[in-house]
Amino acid sequence: MKHRRRSKQQKLNSLPPPTPPATRAPCPMPRPSASPKSPPPATPPPEQGPEVVVPEDWALATDAISSDLSSPVVLVCGPSNSGKSTFTRLLLNKLLPSYGRVGYLDTDVGQPEFSPPGCLSLHIVDEAITDMRNPVLREADRCCFYGDISSKGDPESYLNSLFLLYTYFVEKYRCPGSEMLPLIVNTPGWVKGTGFDMLVEMLRYICPTIVVLIRTRMQRKNLPDGMFWLTGGETEPKVITIDAASRDSLSKSSLKRKDGGGMRERRLVEYFKQCFSSDISLATNKELAYALASLPPYEVPFSDVTVMHLHCEVPRTEIWHSVNATIVGLASSCDTPATAHAVPWCVGLGIVRGVDVQRGLLYVITPVDVQHLQSVDLLLQGLIEIPRSVLQVKGCESPYMSTNVRDKITGKDLYASNLNSPLSRQDDGDSDSGADTM
């Protein structure tokens, strides 16, 4: 992606955004200086709640898995809100002292553990998780932008991304002469109908050495007992069955259901806070909205990028208008694996701040460092949109509704479309909505 950053005043003049209200004060924010290999500024950890109580069968399961000296591949599955994410955090901490580094394949696009919503990602973790209740953003070794919070819309693309990530892990970390890292696979909570079929495909492709089945008290929601995915002749893995943690007391509960849509919004807010230096206080959505409005965007010529629509078809004449005021995945065609179902690697997310059709320019805000942006030539547009909590800040004109395209899409239309964002959709059970937190 060829781009240039001009001075803040020059850039904002080129956009002609709506006139800000008289009460708004300028809020210039510097960009963080980070090397390509350095992780993004850490988000301050949330306050720790009551003491975490680990169920006895969970402790026995993590002990049994950590005693396996053959670098296990562990797949954790069960219905929505049964505790899969929390169990994988416990297991990750249990494996780290023995191996030093542990692979973590996150396949839940609705409630990712370490990435923003809409992503499948592989992480190589080398430090323990200190907060069992709240997931924290981490830099991914590899990431695929699926572009939705549910795999129901395009199961084939979802599985292609998952298989690509697992193949990459095997080739880099489990081939002869490599470290032979263990791997934890966290799966979505959609385990009925097509969701069950997709889980079976995952199990058959990955061939885990250990499968952890989490069961709830509602029998109709549970997966079948035993090795339900095998057809005969395959190597049988070890199956460990545990119960979902009880919730009888908030002070001693291992799990607490949270609003899935709200958690997705908060995760995106935390992601785009990385656009700013870690010493800048952005404690409220209002502060973040002002900061994003003041941040000089990157200028991206139309000729330098191709827009890929992941879940819809858009007329060629409307391609550039369609990405205005949206979140896009930033990817490179050069790094796309040469496979039958090629899925480009995603280096991060960006907000299309505005579109200048006459000059052929996009204006993009992203926390991705300049070195990684040099190779970006694909914008992946899905259904992940700007958090409503940022758009609805009073006294701050949204910077994402550029008047450059008002003849095609009015600000009112864009505002309405964001109110119907998939981030605020009712959870349909295919992800761990509300997350399993300790």
Residue ranges of predicted features:
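Short, structured coil segments at secondary-structure junctions
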Residues: S98, G118, I206-C207, T235
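Phosphate/Mg2+-binding loops and adjacent switch elements
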Residues: E171-G233
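Nucleotide-state-sensitive switch-loop elements of NTP-binding domains
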Residues: V53-E56, A61, L69-V74, G103-L183, ...
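Conserved glycine(s) of the Walker
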Residues: G83
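The conserved Walker
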Residues: S80
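Conserved Walker
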Residues: T86
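Preference for solvent-exposed, low-hydrophobicity sequence contexts
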Residues: M1-P72, V76, L90, K94, ...
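A generic secondary-structure signal
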Residues: D63-A64, L91-K94, L164-K172, E201-M202
